[in-house]
């Protein structure tokens, strides 16, 4: 299963925010600069992350973005569930004439659930704690 770039950059943005001291604000511009992604694309991602409570956005002169809850409470599987379209195949009867008898969708759904269950074993904190090489790459001191 390949994650969409939307989910990929969502995870990267969260990783960046998790690498900052807890509660510290950053900006969308800073995140886009670190990862070299379009600002418009990142705005959409941050808006979605904010809607589901994973990011807090504060407007104004001293505003910015930060994690919506502690990194050790944000499971990677939950992030993927919020950002990723998880349907692997189009099983509508208009698209596939074997849909009424097909068992593949159930197998694929079980595989996706196993994938997500594995991701649930890890939090953002697991991705950043004691990860000096990551801090150096992100220019976080």
Swiss-Prot record:
The molecular function GO annotations come to:
2 iron, 2 sulfur cluster binding; DNA-binding transcription factor activity; double-stranded DNA binding; iron ion binding
What GO biological process terms does the UniProt entry carry, in alphabetical order?
Answer: negative regulation of DNA-templated transcription
- Chain positions recorded as [2Fe-2S] cluster binding sites: 91, 96, 102
Q: Which UniProt keywords apply?
A: 2Fe-2S, DNA-binding, Iron, Iron-sulfur, Metal-binding, Repressor, Transcription, Transcription regulation
Write one Pfam family the protein is assigned to: Rrf2
Q: Which cysteines are joined by disulfide bonds?
A: none
Q: Which residues bind DNA?
A: 28-51
Name its co-factor(s): [2Fe-2S] cluster
The record's listing under InterPro entries reads: TR_Rrf2-type_CS, Tscrpt_reg_Rrf2, Tscrpt_rep_HTH_NsrR, WH-like_DNA-bd_sf, WH_DNA-bd_sf
Give all residue intervals belonging to the HTH rrf2-type domain. 2-129
PROSITE patterns attached to this UniProt entry: HTH_RRF2_1 (PS01332), HTH_RRF2_2 (PS51197)
What binding details are noted for the cofactor? Binds 1 [2Fe-2S] cluster per subunit.
Mind telling me which GO cellular component terms the entry cites? cytosol
Looking up HAMAP family in the UniProt record yields: HTH_type_NsrR
Reported function: Nitric oxide-sensitive repressor of genes involved in protecting the cell against nitrosative stress. May require iron for activity.
Name the record gives this protein: HTH-type transcriptional repressor NsrR
Question: Which species is the source of this protein?
Answer: Yersinia enterocolitica serotype O:8 / biotype 1B (strain NCTC 13174 / 8081)
The upper taxonomy is: Bacteria, Pseudomonadati, Pseudomonadota, Gammaproteobacteria, Enterobacterales
Gene name as annotated: nsrR
